[in-house]
From Swiss-Prot:
Record carries keyword Translocase: no
GO MF, one example: phosphoglycerate mutase activity
Disulfide partners: none
Encoding gene (name): gpmA
EC number, UniProt record: 5.4.2.11
Entry-linked Gene3D superfamilies: Phosphoglycerate mutase-like
Function of the protein: Catalyzes the interconversion of 2-phosphoglycerate and 3-phosphoglycerate.
Source organism of this protein record: Nitrobacter winogradskyi (strain ATCC 25391 / DSM 10237 / CIP 104748 / NCIMB 11846 / Nb-255)
Keyword Repeat: no
Descriptive protein name: 2,3-bisphosphoglycerate-dependent phosphoglycerate mutase
Length: 207
């Protein structure tokens, strides 16, 4: 039986990350730094000897561009790639496109902090982290995890909050624990899974 390998990569810095804007389902591309982060992720995975069988990403360009750059560094651009909005970033609703300082002026520091850091309180017209997990987890269980358990080396390039959903189920974290977990941009996290989908080992390639 092949190893059951799953690699998660958060997209590199986007143009709106740089401008300190709430992004969500808006679709800015990577900055030069973000592209460099993605290429570096590919080099790190190449140094580890990874050969991927399949990749998953969101419908947003910053994640797709990250995946493309990673696969180019690996010389593995021909593998199947599945794109689905289930892996999209949390939808920030009325906050999307706003500078975070502007949002604090409009709604107040405390309210914006609640929207950003609570588990189940959504911003107006948007999703809470709980809502994001409810969208992402079924896709992971039904589409991604079966590939891993079949022994297919699987790469997922997505977003901070959608990847939190995967980390939450893989590491069996509580809502409080997942809220505290930050995923670095462009830093691969490698999971080796047991046959029952529990984590046998984890390696974080951040910096």
């Amino acid at each position: 039986m092949s190893e059951r390998l799953l690699v998660l990569v958060r997209h590199g810095q986007s143009e709106w990350n740089l401008k300190n804007l709430f992004t969500g389902w808006k679709d800015p591309d990577l900055t030069e730094l973000g592209a460099a982060e993605a290429k570096d992720a590919g080099r790190k995975l190449k140094a580890q000897g990874f050969v991927f069988d399949i990749a998953f990403t969101s419908t947003l360009i910053r994640a797709q561009h990250t995946l493309d750059l990673v696969l180019k560094e690996l010389d593995q651009t021909g593998i199947p790639v599945r794109k689905d909005q289930a892996l999209n970033e949390r939808d920030y609703g009325d906050l999307s496109g706003l500078n975070k300082d502007e949002a604090r002026k409009k709604w107040g520091d405390e309210q914006v902090l609640v929207w950003r850091r609570s588990y189940d309180v959504p911003p107006p017209g948007g999703e809470s982290l709980k809502d994001t997990l409810a969208r992402t987890l079924p896709y992971f269980v039904q589409e991604i995890l079966p590939c891993v358990l079949r022994g297919e080396c699987t790469l997922v390039a997505a977003h901070g909050n959608s990847l939190r959903a995967l980390v939450m189920v893989l590491e069996k974290l509580s809502p409080e624990q997942i809220l505290a977990r930050e995923l670095a941009t462009g830093a691969p996290v490698i999971y080796r899974l047991n046959a029952d989908a529990t984590v046998a080992s984890k390696l974080d390639l951040a910096a």
